[in-house]
Amino acid sequence: MEVLEAVKASRSVSKFKSIPIGDDKIQALANAMRMAPSAENLQPWKLIVVSDEDLKRKLSGAVMNGRGLPNAPIVLVACAKLDEATATVGGYMNSYPVDVGMAISYLNLAAVNQGLGTNWVFSFNEEKVREALRIPEGAAHVVALTPLGVPEAPDPPEGRKHTGELLSFNGYE
């Protein structure tokens, strides 16, 4: 599948078939993720693959509406390894939100290419996620949760803004 085809085919998925996801597919997604660009090529991320039903229920309890987590075969938890990200110095932004976001984007496109669906989840209680997955304090920041599986049916496509609404040249318009 061409990259632009994967971008156009990408949808948020909240209902999944109960088909197990093989380790080979997880490894392929991790491989795509590691190819994502990052500041100074530090790759400051850690991906936690959750298949345990009890852990998935705990994670669902940490999410604002639990959307898509309980019925997904896998929940991916994307973390930023704080000691490996560029530091906030001199008023510059720490790179990890962008670095991990890029890595998740690569993973999502690779998932679409494999016929899998995902759905970024950002509304969660980080402390509950950290506790459920035994993430040591100060070791990592949980950036997003992503249910993963074979889509039962993709959510309907949402309208997109025209490029004219998104672009301006040589200044903010």
Please name every model-derived segment:
Residues 3-22, 144-173:
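C-terminal helix-cap and adjacent tail motif
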Residues 25, 30, 35-103:
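Glycine/small-residue-rich phosphate/adenosyl-binding loop
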Residues 25, 52, 130-132, 149:
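Short Asp/Glu-rich motifs
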Residues 33, 76, 91-132:
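Small-aliphatic-rich amphipathic alpha-helix that forms the alpha element of a beta-alpha
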Residues 67-72, 135-157:
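A glycine-rich helix N-cap at a beta->alpha junction
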Residues 82-83, 124-127, 152:
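Acidic, glycine-rich active-site loops and adjacent beta-strand->loop/helix elements
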